[in-house]
Regions:
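Buried hydrophobic packing segments
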Residues: 31, 62-69, 94-102, 133-134, ...
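Anion-binding (especially nucleotide phosphate/pyrophosphate-binding) glycine-rich loop
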Residues: 1-9, 36-118
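Glycine/serine-rich anion-binding loops at beta->alpha junctions
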Residues: 11-12, 16, 20-24, 81-98, ...
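Cysteine-centered functional microenvironments
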Residues: 55-58, 77-88, 115-123, 130-134, ...
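Short Gly/aromatic-enriched secondary-structure transition segments
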Residues: 27-35, 181-184
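Alpha/beta catalytic cores of group-transfer enzymes, especially the acyltransferase/condensing modules
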Residues: 106-155, 253, 258-261
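Solvent-exposed alpha-helices and their adjacent loops that cap or buttress functional pockets
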Residues: 2-3, 10-11, 23-24, 33-34, ...
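C-terminal nucleotide
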Residues: 2-15, 19, 40-57, 63, ...
Length: 302
């Protein structure tokens, strides 16, 4: 039943992608986790769509998902601590929070797919499904192993004494101003160097999930490092500045491993830390913004 005829509230988390980069749009397997940064949307029926919030440019996204779900116009207010352009997928958090408020009865996978269609409509970009699935179906203490081709998924336990650190490289570029689209076309066309990354990254995703279940922390770190080297050398989406930041993270206290996260050419670096290492890790990287996260429940976690 729709709640769009009364006041409603929806909340959804940001997400990190532990491993599985540049494979989602090729139907590969990814391993995201919902994290404890949240977007909360409050709404009620109105004559037209509007949004009062500190989320710049958020209205087209919320309106698109509302229309996708058949909702009447809504007046929305949004509070969020999911920073934009941080690698935590603030857009998916906004979309899924809006869907959860308007249609709490939806199955989480249905909601995620509706949000994917809405984002494609709002942006004109053929976005994948990973971000929306993580925001909808993530579970505290778990990562989400998702096959982007079949949409099969399962939860993988994530240790409560490991911390996720998202490091802002300070380099922010529009993907239109980078070779991102070229890299994607090269991978889709089967260019051997790009396919080598895709195939090895999919193997690393499965190995990472196995290492989580086995409690093999050394393997987790080595897989993150191997993922970065592959993104750097085979997919060629890193930059010298990002490489230097990743290598600094590798030798920082308590860091198991780190890699470029996201589309590349700047953006964020993901590091996996021992719980007690937050302060020494931040002290080792005093010149960049570091955000520490833990796993969290998704909007449709049951």
């Amino acid at each position: 039943m729709s709640t769009s005829d009364r006041t409603w509230i929806g909340r959804a988390p940001g997400r990190v992608n532990l491993i599985g980069e540049h494979v989602d749009y090729l139907g590969g397997v990814v391993l995201p986790a919902a994290v404890d940064r949240f977007t909360t949307v409050r709404g009620h029926p109105a004559d037209d769509w509007s949004m009062a919030s500190g989320v710049p440019g958020g209205l087209p996204y919320a309106r698109a998902v509302g229309e996708e779900l058949g909702a009447s116009p809504q007046a929305l207010s949004v509070v969020s601590d999911v920073p934009p352009a941080s690698g935590l997928s603030s857009s998916a958090a906004l979309l899924v929070a809006t869907a959860a408020g308007l249609r709490p009865d939806l199955d989480g996978a249905e909601a995620a797919l509706a949000c994917q269609r809405a984002e494609q409509r709002a942006t004109g970009v053929q976005v994948g499904v990973m971000d929306q699935f993580a925001a909808a179906l993530g579970r505290r203490g778990h990562a989400l192993l998702l096959d982007c081709g079949t949409l099969d998924y399962r939860l993988v336990p994530f240790p409560g004494d490991l911390v996720l650190a998202v490091i802002d490289s300070g380099i922010h570029r529009s993907l239109a101003d980078t070779p991102y689209n070229l890299r994607r076309r090269e991978a889709e066309s089967g260019m051997p160097q790009r396919r080598r990354h895709v195939e090895s990254e999919i193997r690393r995703v499965h190995e990472f999930a196995d290492a989580l279940e086995a409690g093999d922390r050394s393997a987790l770190g080595e897989l993150l490092k191997a993922s970065h080297r592959s993104l750097r050398d085979d997919f060629e989406v890193s930059t010298p500045e990002v490489d230097a930041l990743v290598e600094r993270a590798w030798v920082a206290p308590g860091c198991l491993g780190a890699r470029l996260m996201g589309a590349g050419f700047g953006g964020s670096v993901l590091a996996l830390l021992e719980m007690g290492a937050k302060d020494p890790f931040r002290e080792a990287l005093p010149d960049v913004v570091v955000r520490f996260c833990n796993t969290a429940d998704g909007a449709y976690a049951r």
